[in-house]
């Protein structure tokens, strides 16, 4: 249980259904979401904000923008369900807001996988986020 709490605090975006988001990232990238993305660049994880450092960091920036576009639900609290079929994330909600929330998380997981080649260890564990340059608005 403690491991899940730590994961919830450090995950990319720190919002939404953190357990599901973490599972999606692990399934798509094969990387531990906490240790690989919990404090990556300027936008992944806690206090994430600023001009993206690379394509991987941009995935997290776009994810935060996706959450900002949601209406009628609470990305910080609402939970959704999804399945993993044939190495594909399938969002399984009838509620439109929860489906959109799931789609935001699915998109970031896929984006992180597609940009694994841009992952730069020098941006991992970036606890200097207050020094990140201001990003353009979503």
From Swiss-Prot:
Q: Where is this site: Important residue of the cationic membrane-docking site (MDoS)?
A: 121, 124
- Site positions (Cationic membrane-docking site (MDoS)): 129, 134
Which stretches are transmembrane?
none
Q: Where is this site: Hydrophobic membrane-disruption site (MDiS)?
A: 128, 131
In this chain, the stretch annotated as Important for membrane-damaging activities in eukaryotes and bacteria covers 121-134
Query: Which GO terms of the molecular function aspect are on file?
Result: calcium ion binding; calcium-dependent phospholipase A2 activity; phospholipid binding; toxin activity
| Record's function text | Snake venom phospholipase A2 homolog that lacks enzymatic activity. Is myotoxic. A model of myotoxic mechanism has been proposed: an apo Lys49-PLA2 is activated by the entrance of a hydrophobic molecule (e.g. fatty acid) at the hydrophobic channel of the protein leading to a reorientation of a monomer. This reorientation causes a transition between 'inactive' to 'active' states, causing alignment of C-terminal and membrane-docking sites (MDoS) side-by-side and putting the membrane-disruption sites (MDiS) in the same plane, exposed to solvent and in a symmetric position for both monomers.
| Name under which the protein is recorded | Basic phospholipase A2 homolog M1-3-3
Q: Which organism is it from?
A: Bothrops asper (Terciopelo)
The organism that produces this protein has a lineage beginning with: Eukaryota, Metazoa, Chordata, Craniata, Vertebrata
